[in-house]
Amino acid sequence: MKSLCLLAIVAVVSAEVYFKEEFNDASWEKRWVQSKHKDDFGAFKLSAGKFFDVESRDQGIQTSQDAKFYSRAAKFDKEFSNKGKTLVIQYTVKHEQGIDCGGGYVKVMRGDADLADFHGETPYNVMFGPDICGPTRRVHVILNYKGENKLIKKEITCKSDELTHLYTLILNADNTYEVKIDGESAQTGSLEEDWDLLPAKKIKDPDAKKPEDWDEREYIDDAEDVKPEDWEKPEHIPDPDAKKPEDWDDEMDGEWEPPMIDNPEYKGEWKPKQIKNPAYKGKWIHPEIENPEYTPDDELYLYENWGAIGFDLWQVKSGTIFDNVLITDSVEEAEAHAAETFDKLKTVEKEKKEKADEEARKVEEEARKKAEEEKEAKKDDDEEEEKEEEEGHDEL
């Protein structure tokens, strides 16, 4: 046990943190550049939200204007390559407003990105994080490969409540990845298999064709099955119980015809029974060959230059809080940082919100009861007033 603890300590000590932002004070505005690409971007403000433990520790930057684009980014202290290393992107998101449509993701870019002109078309290495609009609740993991942005093929569902959640992306040097939400694994896999980064290893043989005599019909009509002679019956017949109305005038109304009814003897279209096809060979499978366009890439994970991170978002309803942004080469460092930030907040935040929700529910219930009592009292007053009016009328 002692050796394991020592290994963990060594791993954290040797870890390199390329970027860390906790938004503990107003100095964040000096580090995060407001894009000037357009003049009506929404404004971020410093806030811990409604429910927190330690305000200075738990505060982050919050979107503050509805129906706005947001664009703000920061440079790392130094640019780096993740060659031969693990890369971890981690941060927290709280959709305190009960978001209906809006992004909560980050874009991690090269160091030469022009942050003053940061916008939706600015190239990036990785885009990661939650995106919600209507029923769609997805964690984006988009990798830029040879100038093209490639979406992950797997569905990862994000959190959509009003609490803080921790999102972690781990890119490994063996071309594998892991997405964690609140410290729990949400998806793992291979970069090659879960993104369309490379051409397919195999393709259908263009020279292969299904033989003309290949029979894929598992069942066929029984040639010996014969339609019964009494099968053909009309679908509808005249109603035998119908009688011409006594006042029916053939000259005025035309020749009377009884209404039609469903024929109880109608059997529908006759079809011969099905039997096993003796010539059935199964479904023909197109043979595959090695794809001459495929070339393996052992460095799908690799980006030679990392140097900036930014929020480029659209939100219909503002109120999302971002905090505890971390870029490191160590999973252990990311876990340690989460333990000092997210883990200390989540329990207290949940308890305070549940208490506030319960108090709000009680207030709402009391208001409902009061409204019902007032409605009932008014009904009694109206009935009493009506009764008095009737008694006065009787006396007259």
From Swiss-Prot:
It comes from Caenorhabditis briggsae. Residues 213-224, 381-396 have a biased composition (Acidic residues). GO terms for biological process: defecation; determination of adult lifespan; endoplasmic reticulum calcium ion homeostasis; ERAD pathway; hemidesmosome assembly; IRE1-mediated unfolded protein response; programmed cell death; protein folding. This is Calreticulin. Residues 1-15 form the signal peptide. Pfam families: Calreticulin. PANTHER family: CALRETICULIN, CALRETICULIN AND CALNEXIN. Residues 186-250 are annotated as: 4 X approximate repeats. It is found in: Endoplasmic reticulum lumen. Residues 202-212, 225-246, 342-380 have a biased composition (Basic and acidic residues).
